[in-house]
Amino acid sequence: MANVSALLTIALLLCSTLMCTARPEPAISISITTAADPCNMEKKIEGKLDDMHMVDENCGADDEDCLMRRTLVAHTDYIYTQKKKHP
């Protein structure tokens, strides 16, 4: 009985180490030493969003995917900007 429990323990340890090494590394690694400024991050994100909106897609009448994307962007923009105070 002791051999079975020892074998199961070794198998469990082996499986756990294999699971840790099989996990893919994160695509984006953020340094902990870099302090993130929330105001600066918001400006960067808004700048990237503005750059994305600069590219205007011309959708044809038959391009249903394009129309769906534009509708989704419009709804998302409305949802996230309706509470902002406009100057």
Curated annotation (Swiss-Prot):
Sulfation is important for activity and for the binding to a putative membrane receptor. PSK-beta is an enzymatic derivative of PSK-alpha. Residues 23-77, 83-87 form a propeptide. Belongs to the phytosulfokine family. This is Phytosulfokines 2. InterPro entries: Phytosulfokine. Promotes plant cell differentiation, organogenesis and somatic embryogenesis as well as cell proliferation. Its main location: secreted. GO terms for biological process: cell differentiation; cell population proliferation. It is found in: Secreted. Expressed in stems, roots and leaves. Keywords: Developmental protein, Differentiation, Growth factor, Secreted, Signal, Sulfation. Residues 1-22 form the signal peptide. One of its GO terms (cellular component) is extracellular matrix. Induction: Up-regulated by fungal infection. GO terms for molecular function: growth factor activity. The modification Sulfotyrosine is found at residues 78, 80. It holds the Pfam family PSK.
